[in-house]
């Protein structure tokens, strides 16, 4: 057995003679580290000491709408009395606005749901050649007429889904497809005008003038 181990065992056994020491083959099991790790005596906690339990300063502690527990003292709603609801018989009748802008999101008969006969009664879409002859103001007005009509179709489709009517989907989809073709044509015409303006600006920067050709003729 190593001398340091024998000396350490002798000190730990309070000076017992060598006869009472364990045999040498048990020395590895009785080997202790020279530096002992400190043993923690208190339980682990991530809370600071100054943040220990004290007086609860939360006045709404325990207030729960689920368990129907209210505050510890009564609270007033307001310093003014609550208004009392008016009975329907005493309400003042208001006249409807016949020309309100929101009526544009409903059919002409102002019903909440458009009928298949109403949705299928429409013409064809505008062709690109017809749209080329329109002015900027006409194209602008036609675009927003298409937008309002598509919003009306979307409103009817939402109401149809809510009521689970089971009819009118095909007619509304065909009407919406026709309107989208017109909108795509308006975009195409505006794109052509934009390219034409870009080409004219490029030619002007290069020095081209239409009146020069007229003078040569």
Curated annotation (Swiss-Prot):
GO BP field: mitochondrial translation
Top-rank taxon: Eukaryota
Primary site of residence: mitochondrion
UniProt subcellular location: Mitochondrion
InterPro entries: MRP-L47_sf, Ribosomal_uL29_mit
GO cellular component: mitochondrial large ribosomal subunit
Keyword Ribosomal protein: yes
Family designation: Belongs to the universal ribosomal protein uL29 family.
Name of the protein described by the UniProt record: Large ribosomal subunit protein uL29m
Species name: Aspergillus fumigatus (strain ATCC MYA-4609 / CBS 101355 / FGSC A1100 / Af293) (Neosartorya fumigata)
